[in-house]
Protein backbone atom coordinates (compact mmCIF):
# COMPACT_ATOMS: atom_id res chain seq x y z
CA UNK A 1 0.00 0.00 0.00
CA UNK A 2 1.22 3.48 -0.85
CA UNK A 3 1.61 6.16 1.80
CA UNK A 4 1.94 9.46 -0.05
CA UNK A 5 -0.66 11.70 -1.68
CA UNK A 6 1.93 14.16 -3.01
CA UNK A 7 1.28 13.13 -6.63
CA UNK A 8 -2.39 14.14 -6.31
CA UNK A 9 -3.59 17.66 -7.16
CA UNK A 10 -3.18 20.17 -4.33
CA UNK A 11 -6.94 20.71 -4.10
CA UNK A 12 -7.49 16.97 -3.71
CA UNK A 13 -4.85 16.84 -0.97
CA UNK A 14 -6.73 19.61 0.86
CA UNK A 15 -10.04 17.75 0.46
CA UNK A 16 -8.48 14.57 1.84
CA UNK A 17 -7.09 16.47 4.85
CA UNK A 18 -10.56 17.82 5.65
CA UNK A 19 -12.13 14.38 5.20
CA UNK A 20 -9.54 12.78 7.48
CA UNK A 21 -10.13 15.40 10.17
CA UNK A 22 -13.91 14.94 9.97
CA UNK A 23 -13.67 11.15 10.06
CA UNK A 24 -11.38 11.19 13.10
CA UNK A 25 -13.59 13.66 14.96
CA UNK A 26 -16.91 11.95 14.12
CA UNK A 27 -16.14 8.21 14.26
CA UNK A 28 -14.67 6.40 17.24
CA UNK A 29 -11.87 3.83 17.34
CA UNK A 30 -10.58 4.58 13.84
CA UNK A 31 -7.63 2.34 13.06
CA UNK A 32 -6.92 3.24 9.42
CA UNK A 33 -8.19 5.50 6.67
CA UNK A 34 -7.39 4.39 3.12
CA UNK A 35 -7.98 6.20 -0.17
CA UNK A 36 -8.87 3.72 -2.90
CA UNK A 37 -10.30 3.78 -6.41
CA UNK A 38 -9.32 6.01 -9.31
CA UNK A 39 -7.47 8.60 -7.22
CA UNK A 40 -5.35 5.92 -5.53
CA UNK A 41 -4.59 4.26 -8.87
CA UNK A 42 -3.71 7.59 -10.52
CA UNK A 43 -6.51 7.21 -13.08
CA UNK A 44 -8.84 9.91 -11.79
CA UNK A 45 -10.81 12.34 -13.94
CA UNK A 46 -10.89 15.93 -12.69
CA UNK A 47 -13.62 16.94 -15.15
CA UNK A 48 -14.89 15.44 -18.38
CA UNK A 49 -17.58 16.85 -20.61
CA UNK A 50 -18.76 14.86 -23.62
CA UNK A 51 -21.42 15.30 -26.26
CA UNK A 52 -23.18 12.44 -27.97
CA UNK A 53 -24.53 12.37 -31.53
CA UNK A 54 -27.87 13.81 -30.36
CA UNK A 55 -26.15 16.79 -28.76
CA UNK A 56 -26.71 15.58 -25.19
CA UNK A 57 -23.99 16.75 -22.83
CA UNK A 58 -22.76 14.45 -20.09
CA UNK A 59 -20.35 15.32 -17.33
CA UNK A 60 -18.09 13.04 -15.35
CA UNK A 61 -15.76 13.48 -12.42
CA UNK A 62 -14.07 10.92 -10.19
CA UNK A 63 -15.17 10.84 -6.57
CA UNK A 64 -13.04 10.27 -3.50
CA UNK A 65 -13.36 6.66 -2.32
CA UNK A 66 -12.46 6.16 1.34
CA UNK A 67 -12.25 2.98 3.41
CA UNK A 68 -12.36 3.51 7.18
CA UNK A 69 -11.28 0.59 9.33
CA UNK A 70 -12.56 0.97 12.87
CA UNK A 71 -13.50 -1.08 15.90
CA UNK A 72 -17.26 -0.94 16.00
CA UNK A 73 -20.05 -3.36 16.79
CA UNK A 74 -22.03 -2.13 13.79
CA UNK A 75 -20.06 -1.13 10.69
CA UNK A 76 -23.30 -0.43 8.80
CA UNK A 77 -24.39 2.07 11.45
CA UNK A 78 -20.96 3.77 11.35
CA UNK A 79 -21.17 3.92 7.55
CA UNK A 80 -24.64 5.46 7.74
CA UNK A 81 -23.27 8.00 10.23
CA UNK A 82 -20.51 8.83 7.74
CA UNK A 83 -23.08 9.42 4.98
CA UNK A 84 -25.51 11.37 7.15
CA UNK A 85 -23.07 13.41 9.28
CA UNK A 86 -19.53 13.45 7.86
CA UNK A 87 -20.42 14.00 4.19
CA UNK A 88 -22.76 16.98 4.93
CA UNK A 89 -20.10 18.52 7.22
CA UNK A 90 -17.56 18.02 4.44
CA UNK A 91 -19.93 19.69 1.95
CA UNK A 92 -20.32 22.68 4.28
CA UNK A 93 -16.57 23.01 4.96
CA UNK A 94 -15.63 22.70 1.30
CA UNK A 95 -18.50 24.72 -0.18
CA UNK A 96 -17.31 26.45 -3.33
CA UNK A 97 -13.87 24.83 -3.05
CA UNK A 98 -14.51 21.22 -3.97
CA UNK A 99 -15.68 19.20 -6.89
CA UNK A 100 -19.37 18.27 -6.97
CA UNK A 101 -18.98 14.51 -6.54
CA UNK A 102 -19.53 13.67 -2.86
CA UNK A 103 -17.01 11.38 -1.18
CA UNK A 104 -17.86 7.70 -0.94
CA UNK A 105 -17.03 6.42 2.57
CA UNK A 106 -17.27 2.76 3.52
CA UNK A 107 -16.64 1.49 7.05
CA UNK A 108 -15.42 -2.00 7.94
CA UNK A 109 -14.05 -3.71 11.03
CA UNK A 110 -10.50 -5.08 11.32
CA UNK A 111 -11.92 -8.63 11.53
CA UNK A 112 -13.90 -8.18 8.30
CA UNK A 113 -10.91 -6.71 6.47
CA UNK A 114 -8.50 -9.45 7.53
CA UNK A 115 -11.02 -12.20 6.73
CA UNK A 116 -11.52 -10.68 3.27
CA UNK A 117 -7.78 -10.30 2.66
CA UNK A 118 -7.13 -13.87 3.81
CA UNK A 119 -9.72 -15.05 1.26
CA UNK A 120 -8.33 -12.72 -1.43
CA UNK A 121 -11.75 -11.07 -1.72
CA UNK A 122 -11.30 -9.04 -4.90
CA UNK A 123 -12.74 -5.71 -3.69
CA UNK A 124 -10.77 -5.47 -0.44
CA UNK A 125 -7.66 -7.11 -1.88
CA UNK A 126 -7.53 -4.43 -4.60
CA UNK A 127 -8.03 -1.66 -2.01
CA UNK A 128 -5.08 -2.92 0.02
CA UNK A 129 -2.95 -3.50 -3.09
CA UNK A 130 -3.62 -0.13 -4.80
CA UNK A 131 -4.77 2.08 -1.92
CA UNK A 132 -3.05 5.00 -0.25
CA UNK A 133 -2.85 4.94 3.53
CA UNK A 134 -4.03 8.33 4.82
CA UNK A 135 -4.10 7.52 8.53
CA UNK A 136 -2.84 4.69 10.72
CA UNK A 137 -3.11 4.70 14.51
CA UNK A 138 -0.56 1.87 14.64
CA UNK A 139 -2.79 -0.69 16.37
CA UNK A 140 -3.89 -2.77 13.39
CA UNK A 141 -1.89 -4.97 11.06
CA UNK A 142 -3.49 -5.89 7.75
CA UNK A 143 -3.19 -9.62 7.20
CA UNK A 144 -1.73 -11.42 4.23
CA UNK A 145 -3.62 -13.44 1.64
CA UNK A 146 -3.37 -17.18 2.10
CA UNK A 147 -3.39 -20.09 -0.30
CA UNK A 148 -6.70 -21.69 0.54
CA UNK A 149 -7.77 -25.28 -0.07
CA UNK A 150 -10.33 -25.80 -2.82
CA UNK A 151 -13.04 -26.77 -0.31
CA UNK A 152 -12.69 -23.43 1.48
CA UNK A 153 -12.65 -21.42 -1.77
CA UNK A 154 -15.84 -23.19 -2.86
CA UNK A 155 -17.49 -22.49 0.50
CA UNK A 156 -16.64 -18.76 0.31
CA UNK A 157 -17.94 -18.56 -3.26
CA UNK A 158 -21.24 -20.13 -2.20
CA UNK A 159 -21.57 -17.69 0.73
CA UNK A 160 -21.14 -14.68 -1.53
What are these regions (language model features)?
Residues 1-61, 70-160:
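Catalytic core of pol beta-like nucleotidyltransferases
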Residues 65:
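Cell-envelope/extracellular polymer assembly enzymes that use nucleotide-activated donors
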Amino acid sequence: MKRSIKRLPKRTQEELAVLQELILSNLTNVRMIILYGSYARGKYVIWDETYDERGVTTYYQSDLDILVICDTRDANKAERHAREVIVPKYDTRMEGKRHPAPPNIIVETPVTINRAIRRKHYFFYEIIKDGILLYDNGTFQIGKPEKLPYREIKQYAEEE
